[in-house]
Each structure stands twice: as C-alpha cells, then as structure tokens.
Amino acid sequence: MKLGKILVPLDGSMLAEGALSNAVDLAEKYGATISLLRAAEAFTMPGADAVEAQATAVREAEEYLAAVVRRLANRVIGRVETHVGCGAAAAASVEAAAVQKADLIVMSTHGRSGLGRLVLGRVTESVLRGTTVPILVVRADHAPLDAPSGARQAERASHV
C-alpha cells in the first residue's frame, strides 16, 4: 500500500483529535505526510461584518492548527502540513482531499452503541459520500495526543 498523504480533518474538538494517533502511526509506518485541515466557517448576525467574521474564523483556525502541530512535534517524525478550508466542514474536507491528492482520510466518530452505532457522524457520513478517497473512521473513545489544557476555550468563552 502506498500512502503519500493522509488528510486529517479537525474541528477543534477532542473527539476529532482522537484520529490523530492513528494518522501519526500510519504516517510513520508508510513515510506519509500528514495534512491537518480545519474548516473556517463564519456565522454572523444580521448587520455584522461578514468579511471580518470570516477573517477572524480563518485566523482562529490557523492558530488552532499551529497549536496541534506544536503538540505533535515530539511524536511526528515525518512532515506535517496545515490547511484552512472555507465553508462547511464536510465540503472543505472533500475539496481538500481532491486538491491535495490525499491517499487516505482519517476521521473520528462517536463510539455509540445500540441504534446510534448504525449512523456515523453527520460530517463523517457526508465526507464518505462525497469522496472516492478511502476513509479510516476511528472510534474516538480515547483522549487525543497531548490533550490541550483548555485555556484557549476558556479565553474564547470569556469574550462571548
């Protein structure tokens, strides 16, 4: 199997970051590049500056990805790229997989039981339906690599 590029879509949640460990293991085994993606979709209230809101969303996505790269620095031997997509997460993931010529997409989903296990997460299912790139769906029962402290989320919440 040839794996040159592994796309890992992230939404800022620990659930999504649950896929990082698997992506890192595969990248090390196959010498692949990890491409971290964060979709930046600004939601604005009527009368708000949509351009400024989108610029803020992109900046926050870039800061988040930089923090993930710093946390991965002691674990990843190979190359890590970051990309910010604009728009909805599923569409940005499908587009990034095509543009970057990804060989694999690694995503996480809830570890549900019963009827819930029959349905993947909404974004994961949309990506699965929208791409021909193979997808490894990881059940995110565990913490991500070097979990963040939560300070960034607390700071963001204080500005609401």
Regions found by a protein language model. Name each.
Residues L37, E81-G85, L136:
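General small-molecule cofactor/ligand-binding pocket signal
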Residues K2-D49, A140-A143, Q153-V160:
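Small/aliphatic-rich secondary-structure junction motif
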Residues E52-E63:
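A short acidic, glycine-rich active-site loop
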Residues V123, T131-T132:
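Short, structured coil segments at secondary-structure junctions
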Residues M1, L15, R70-I105, A143-V160:
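Structural beta-alpha unit
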Residues S108, I135-R139:
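Short beta-strand elements of ligand-binding domains
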Residues L104-S126, P144-P148:
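Glycine-rich, Arg-bearing micro-motifs that act as flexible, cationic patches
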